[in-house]
Amino acid sequence: MKTLHVIAAAAAATSLWVVAAESVGKLPPPWFISGDHATSYQAGIDNVETISGKGAKFLRYAQGEDKGFGSLVQVISAQRYLGQRVRFRAMIKTRDVSNWAGLWMQVQAQQRQNAAFYNSSDQPIKGTAAWQARSVTLDVPEDGTTISFGVINAGSGQVWIDQLSFEVVGKIVPVDVMPAARLPEKPVL
């Protein structure tokens, strides 16, 4: 009888492993991993942890020192958005994020590498959090060249994004701005 239980347990574990292996797919191009510790992260499509039913993109800390960050990124031409306000929205979920996670977007221009930037560090998602709606809104200047956007994971843990959208919005929608660093009032010598 014990032998039968052991065989049943082994079969169940094998079945779970097969289901887990089948639930993760490759990350579709043009998405890629970036960041100062990009090689410490893995990314793909998770068909289990999804709310759209189409699979959620994930970014998971896999190895290395628990320092720096990884980011799941897509870069597009700014050409069709010149002079407009754009918003990147997604549902986001985290598990065991050691530092913080959030959506981000950057606009580069001919004369300025960082024409506009926001990374959600002032509205961090930490630890384990259920699905929640987040967005980033920026203006694209007339000389814009590229728009980069995605999700950042600073530290260990895993983050998922699903139900993504990228759209032009009206000027009534406020732009996200990074908080200004407080500068000293006088020099420290």
Language model segments and positions:
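Hydrophobic transmembrane signal anchors and adjacent membrane-proximal interface regions, especially
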Residues: 6-7, 170
